[in-house]
Amino acid sequence: MSDKFAPATLVGRPPDRKHQIMRQLRREIVSGALAPGAPFPTREAIINRFGASPGTVNSAVDELRSEGFIEPRGRLGTFVTRNPPHLTRYAVLFAVERGSNQWTGYYTALSNAIAEANRLAGENGPAIATYSNMHRTWLSRDFRTLTEDVVEQRIAGLIFATSPYDLRETPLLEEDGVPRVAVAALASDWPFPTVGLDGVSFRERSLEYLTGLGRRRVALIGPHRETEWAPVIAANGMETRPYWLHPINMAAPESARGIAHLLTRLPADDRPDALVVTDDNLLDHVLAGLLAAGTRLPEELAIVAHCNFDGTSTSALPLARLGYDARRVLAACIDLVNTQRRGVNPAALTPIPAQFAWEIDPPAEEPALI
């Protein structure tokens, strides 16, 4: 832990005696000098070592216990816990406020995967904590809480649900000795590993599926780059037209409804017979537009829709859902944190390929938290 990010320093005053004692004892646990399951010094020994009052030492020991570093075992004394937080408490950071209009289907799927992993780990097992509204940095209560958790070494590693551009020059990116991993669409220049959602596999598999249905005229609705799709469209013997390609401003997702309606109002010989929706946050709007137009699915239009899976997603709609299993994403992130904690340099990029719903509905393998 670097002193420049110590919480007491952040608020402009030196740490008091209690927190000095806590910080030193915590360092000894984190360094392994006091290993998991090892006896913890008695309160009398701590009083003698630091020359502190019984009240100060009692308060310090009680707080270390509440943090999860130590536990009493009756007459046997006090011991370092077998699962101290610096080894078993992972933090997942969401850029935006939970439940806000910026909260996405991906965030929901990842949150559900986290809840399931915590349920399976049990009350005394490793845990994944979530922190939201990170983009507001010091204005966010979660940011301030997590900053203190990090500098006081109460976190095993940080998992950024998206690239953490807003967190530059903050302890969450600057503090030494903290394993980190980010989830992103592409490899990044961050000095820590990335779990990448493989867009190449999404493009290839969606068009291969539609070609297999005999479809040849493909439209796109959603955030996409035409230059990335054009080679794959051509490779599958398909065609598209400029007015079938509709990049959407995700700040106004409802615009997808009118676009979908218009696509199916074109003359029959100028109408697509296949549609790829490239963001799951648009799907409801697209389907509303198609319903208003009276489009018959899949007879008139076959759809591949992007999806973030969490093991709970189901759909009776006549479309194919293709995307990324949030449980698999989470498991990869946890594994990369653990790899770093073991002192091993992991691969810079761990790609997560796109899968169809029927390929991951048996449940995916759950994250190995330890």
Residues of each region from the PLM?
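Extreme N-terminal segment that seeds HTH/winged-HTH DNA-binding domains in transcriptional regulators
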Residues: M1-G55, N101, G105-Y106, L349, ...
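Short beta-strand elements in bilobed, periplasmic/extracellular small-molecule ligand-binding domains
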Residues: N118-W138, A219-L220, A230-A260
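Flexible loop/turn connectors
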Residues: Q24, A260-I370
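Periplasmic-binding protein-like
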Residues: A91-L93, R154-T162, A219-G222, D269-L282, ...
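Amphipathic helical "hinge" segments at domain boundaries
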Residues: P15-R23, S31, R43, P84-D149, ...
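Hydrophobic alpha-helical segments within soluble ligand-binding/sensing domains
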Residues: I21, T88, P193-I221, S255-T264, ...
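Flexible loop/hinge segments that line or gate small-molecule binding clefts
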Residues: A161-F202, C307-L319
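An alpha-beta-alpha
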Residues: S206-W244, P346-A364
